[in-house]
Structures are given as C-alpha cells and as structure tokens.
Amino acid sequence: MRQILIAVGLALAVSILLTPVLIRLFTRQGFGHEIREDGPPTHHKKRGTPSMGGVAILAGIWVSYLGTHLVGLALDGEGPSASGLLVLGLATALGIVGFIDDLIKIRRARNLGLNKTAKTVGILAAALLFGVLALQFGNADGLTPGSPELSYVREIATVTLAPMIFVLFCVVLVSAWSNAVNFTDGLDGLAAGAMAMVCAAYVLITFWQYRNACATSPGLGCYNVRDPLDLALVAAAAAGACIGFLWWNAAPAKIFMGDTGSLALGGIIAGLSVTSRTEILAVVLGALFVAEVTSVVVQILAFRTTGRRVFRMAPFHHHFELVGWAETTVIIRFWLLTAIACGLGVALFYGEWLTAVGA
C-alpha cells in the first residue's frame, strides 16, 4: 500500500509541475490545437490552445513507476515486472503514434494528422507486439502476463483462445480502447477525469488480486494474475498523472492531452484489462468510453444505411452541447456516470469474489 501511495504522489507531482512548463514551451513554439470546422461553435475560441499535453501524463507515469521501484528496491521490494513493463510499453508506443499525429496537425495547421492507414498501422503494430509478448515471460508458476482464456473478473475456463486468436483479440481490444478514449477527449478535462476514476478502480481491483493471489494465498477465490501488485502501481501512476494533468486541463483548458495522451491512456486500459484478466469487466469500468465510441459507430452506420443521423453530432458529448447543455454540465454529468460505472464494476468484482469463497 505504501508503494501505491508513493506512485500516486510521484505521478501527480511530475504531471502537475511539468504541464505548465509544456504550456509555455508549446505556446512559444506555436504548437496550438486546431478545431474541427464542423464542431460546436463554442469550441472555436479554443483554437490555438497548446496540445500534446499527453507528454506530461506519460512522463508522470514513467517517473512514478521507476521511482517507486527504486524506493521499493531500497526497502527490499521487487523490481519492475514483465506485466507492468508490457502495459507501459504499449501505452508509450501508442503515445508515440499520437505524438506524430499531433505534430503533423500542428505543422499543417489543420485538424488532420496522420492519414488513416498510417495511424491504423501504428496502432496495429503496437497491439500485435503486445499480444505476442503477453503470452511470453512465464514465471515460476507458469503464469504469463496475458492468458489465452477469456476473462470476466478472472479467467473463464470454458473459453480458451488459440494463441493466434488471442493475439487478434488483443489487437481488437487495443484498437477499440485507444479509439474510445480518443473520441472521448473532446471536452475540457472529460477524458482525464474519467481515466483517473477508471485507473483508481483498477488500483482497488489489482491490489485485491495481490492480497488474494493463488501463489501466496491458495484457496477459494484466489487469482492467477502474474504481477498484480505491479499492475496496481501502474494504475496508481496513471491515476495520479491524470489528476495532475487535470489541474491544467479542466475547463477552461490551458492545454489539451492530444492524441499523444488519449491513445496512450487507451493503451493503459487495454493493457490493464488483459494483464489483470478483466477484459469483460473493463467494459463496465470504462462504460463512458464505450458509449462514446459506440455513438460514433452508430452515427456512421445510420447515415450510410438510411441517410439520417441519430445524433446531432458524434461523439455524443457534442450532441448534448448542441441541444443546449453547457460544456461544464456535460463534463460533470459524464464524470458522475463514470463514477457510477466504476463503483458498479468494483462491486461486480467483489461480488464475484464473495460468490467464489462461498460467503
């Protein structure tokens, strides 16, 4: 628990202190955000706001993760794990794709960065590598970071995926989550605040898995997760970094995370869900992100098949703006819905454990 608190504190400190430095630097360099022309009229005043703030989030996560482990090693703790490094590696790779996308948008002074093919290839490459490596690095108990068995809050023994299918499943998860967070990042602080809550929920889940790991506490309800404590540190670092960034990203935002941050944070959710064996539960925890990306898919399908739109604009947070909700109202209400979803997800996780132990 001490390491988790250190991870949150370090990430928050780095993020909240580095972000204003980036604001000044990016402002001097003219790294301003471009606004989509067909977006809500109230958003045009945001044109020129510095972007690529995801650099501060990733920096906060990495400094926190490595710093916490240095402290842990001094206190006879363990070093970084395969699971933790895989999740952070995935997030960083996606963050690099997002950074290139953001940079191209800025250079071209328009809201169009990497073309769809290049961006998709970058995301798929990161996802494929993650999926392949997730089934490597078996520990003394034979546990690998990922499991070919589909998972709800633990592995579903009746649904086992072939290695190749598992890798493809990881590709779908990574692509879906990275795009989901990316679509959600359209209002000041919305994605950062929601991510902080989802990551906080994952801290509780992975720490509980650590306290009830089959390797140390065999018995009813134990969890076969390779590195649960290290995953808790990753989740704690991500939560702290998002909170620190939110200080500057809250409405009216002084900086945006850009694709650098949104793609990386989508990778955090995808990576944590695979390595903690909670791929299905993650849909509940990240219900806001799921709803946002679903609204885009529904809008596209409806328009292509009927020629009509379901929402005034997608993602659907813009729909609520266009029907008269103030931006801050949308943000706060969506945060509340995220808090409810996270609470429900944690309750489902704990309820399954109670059932497993026969309580």
Swiss-Prot record:
Its main location: membrane. GO terms for cellular component: plasma membrane. Belongs to the glycosyltransferase 4 family. MraY subfamily. It catalyses: UDP-N-acetyl-alpha-D-muramoyl-L-alanyl-gamma-D-glutamyl-meso-2,6-diaminopimeloyl-D-alanyl-D-alanine + di-trans,octa-cis-undecaprenyl phosphate = di-trans,octa-cis-undecaprenyl diphospho-N-acetyl-alpha-D-muramoyl-L-alanyl-D-glutamyl-meso-2,6-diaminopimeloyl-D-alanyl-D-alanine + UMP. It comes from Mycobacterium sp. (strain KMS). The chain crosses the membrane at residues 3-23, 55-75, 84-104, 120-140, 156-176, 187-207, 231-251, 255-275, 280-300, 334-354. It is found in: Cell membrane. It is a multi-pass membrane protein. Its cofactor is Mg(2+). Pathway: Cell wall biogenesis; peptidoglycan biosynthesis. Keywords: Cell cycle, Cell division, Cell membrane, Cell shape, Cell wall biogenesis/degradation, Magnesium, Membrane, Metal-binding, Peptidoglycan synthesis, Transferase, Transmembrane, Transmembrane helix. One of its GO terms (molecular function) is phospho-N-acetylmuramoyl-pentapeptide-transferase activity. This is Phospho-N-acetylmuramoyl-pentapeptide-transferase. Catalyzes the initial step of the lipid cycle reactions in the biosynthesis of the cell wall peptidoglycan: transfers peptidoglycan precursor phospho-MurNAc-pentapeptide from UDP-MurNAc-pentapeptide onto the lipid carrier undecaprenyl phosphate, yielding undecaprenyl-pyrophosphoryl-MurNAc-pentapeptide, known as lipid I. Pfam families: Glycos_transf_4, MraY_sig1. One of its GO terms (biological process) is peptidoglycan biosynthetic process.
